[in-house]
C-alpha cells in the first residue's frame, strides 16, 4: 500500500478580480487562528471594516503579479508536486492542499484516501499558529471524521534542517554581490501570538538560541533561520539584517518592520541590498508585489540604488532534494 504525502500551503484567490479576492480574504480572515478575537468581534472587524476596503486594494495587488498561468503561488506549488512526485517515484502519492481557496485540503485528502500512512508537510519553514497550526488543525479535523484514519506523521517546522538552509542559500548566493547588504524579510505576526507560544516576553534582539521555552516561538525561529543562512553564506553580522513584513491593522506586530528598516539602512550608508524572504517557499503576493514592487519603490525613493529580490525556492531542484530528504527521514 502506498504512503501519502500531503503538502500544505496558505492559498490564493481563484482569479484576481475583486469578487474572487473578497471570497478568499473572507475565508482567510475569519479563521480564528489568524484574527484571534472572539467570534462576533472578529466577524464585525472582517465584514464591516476589512473586506469593504481591503478587497479592491488586494485585487489590484494580485493583478500586478497575475500571469497567463494564473497565480504564481499556485503554479509554483503545482510544479513542485509534479517534480517531487517524479523524484519520489512510487515511494509516495503526493497531493497539494491549500488552507484557503483551491485546491482545498479536503480535496487533497480525498486523493490520498487509499494511503495507509500519511506524512503532513506544511510548507512553512517556521512554525506559527496562524499558518502551520491552522493548516494542521483543518487537516486533522477532516481525518477525525473518517472511518479509517491512516497513521500520521507531521513535520511541524523545518527551519533548522540543513537541507532547507543549504537549498535556500544556494538559490540566494548568485544574487549576493560585493558591497550589497542582505535583508531577510519574514512574514510578520501580532506580538500577542508570540506570548501565546509560550514566550512571556519579547526578546529585545535576536531571540536566539532556541531552547525549550521558545522552541515554538515564530520570531525566535526566524532569527535562527537568519543566523543559519548567514553562516551558510559566510556573512558577517554587519552584512545582514532581519525584519518582518505584511503587518495588518494597528496592533503591535513583531519588529523590526521591513518597511521601516529601509531608512535605518540608508542612514548607515547602505545603498545596495539583496532581499530574501525565507518564510515563503514559493513566490506569491507577499514576495512579488509587497517586496518586489512596493518595497523596491520605497527603497529607491529613500535614495537607495540597487534592490535585488531573490526568488523563492519554488520548484528548484535543490528544494526538491531537500523535501525528499526531510520527508524520508520521517519514515
Swiss-Prot record:
Superkingdom of the source species: Bacteria
Coiled-coil regions listed: none
EC number: 4.98.1.1
Keyword flag Cytoplasm: yes
Keyword Lyase: yes
Gene3D superfamilies in UniProt: 3.40.50.1400
UniProt binding sites for Fe cation: 187, 286
Cellular component terms (Gene Ontology): cytoplasm
InterPro entries: Ferrochelatase, Ferrochelatase_C, Ferrochelatase_N
GO molecular function: ferrochelatase activity; metal ion binding
Family affiliation: Belongs to the ferrochelatase family.
Protein name: Ferrochelatase
Lineage: Bacteria, Pseudomonadati, Pseudomonadota, Gammaproteobacteria, Legionellales
Gene name in the database record: hemH
Amino acid at each position: 500500500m502506498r504512503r501519502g504525502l500531503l503538502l500544505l500551503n496558505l492559498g490564493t484567490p481563484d482569479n484576481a478580480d475583486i469578487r474572487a479576492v473578497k471570497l478568499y480574504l473572507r475565508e482567510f480572515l475569519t479563521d480564528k487562528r489568524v484574527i484571534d478575537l472572539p467570534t462576533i468581534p472578529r466577524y464585525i472587524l472582517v465584514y464591516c471594516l476589512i473586506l469593504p476596503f481591503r478587497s479592491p486594494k488586494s485585487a489590484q495587488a494580485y493583478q500586478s503579479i497575475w500571469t497567463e498561468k494564473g497565480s504564481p503561488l499556485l503554479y509554483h506549488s503545482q510544479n513542485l508536486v509534479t517534480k517531487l512526485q517524479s523524484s519520489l517515484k512510487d515511494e509516495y502519492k503526493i497531493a497539494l492542499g491549500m488552507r484557503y481557496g483551491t485546491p482545498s485540503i479536503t480535496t487533497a485528502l480525498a486523493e490520498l484516501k487509499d494511503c495507509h500512512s500519511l506524512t503532513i508537510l506544511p510548507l512553512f519553514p517556521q512554525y506559527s499558529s496562524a499558518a502551520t497550526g491552522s493548516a494542521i488543525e483543518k487537516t486533522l479535523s477532516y481525518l477525525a471524521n473518517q472511518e479509517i484514519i491512516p497513521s500520521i506523521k507531521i513535520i511541524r517546522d523545518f527551519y533548522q534542517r540543513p537541507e532547507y538552509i543549504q537549498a535556500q542559500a544556494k538559490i540566494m548566493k548568485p544574487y549576493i554581490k560585493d558591497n550589497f547588504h542582505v535583508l531577510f524579510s519574514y512574514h510578520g505576526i501580532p506580538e500577542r501570538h508570540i506570548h501565546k507560544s509560550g514566550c512571556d516576553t519579547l526578546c529585545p534582539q535576536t531571540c536566539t538560541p532556541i531552547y525549550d521555552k521558545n522552541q515554538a516561538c515564530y520570531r525566535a525561529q526566524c532569527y535562527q533561520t537568519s543566523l543559519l543562512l548567514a553562516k551558510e553564506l559566510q556573512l558577517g553580522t554587519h552584512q545582514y539584517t532581519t525584519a518582518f513584513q505584511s503587518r495588518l491593522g494597528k496592533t503591535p506586530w513583531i519588529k523590526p518592520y521591513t518597511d521601516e528598516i529601509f531608512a535605518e539602512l540608508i542612514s548607515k550608508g547602505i545603498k545596495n541590498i539583496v532581499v530574501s524572504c525565507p518564510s515563503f517557499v514559493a513566490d506569491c503576493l507577499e514576495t512579488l508585489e509587497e517586496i518586489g514592487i512596493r518595497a523596491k519603490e520605497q527603497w529607491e525613493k529613500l535614495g537607495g540604488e540597487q534592490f535585488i529580490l531573490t526568488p523563492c525556492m519554488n520548484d528548484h531542484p535543490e528544494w526538491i532534494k531537500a523535501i525528499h530528504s526531510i520527508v524520508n527521514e520521517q519514515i
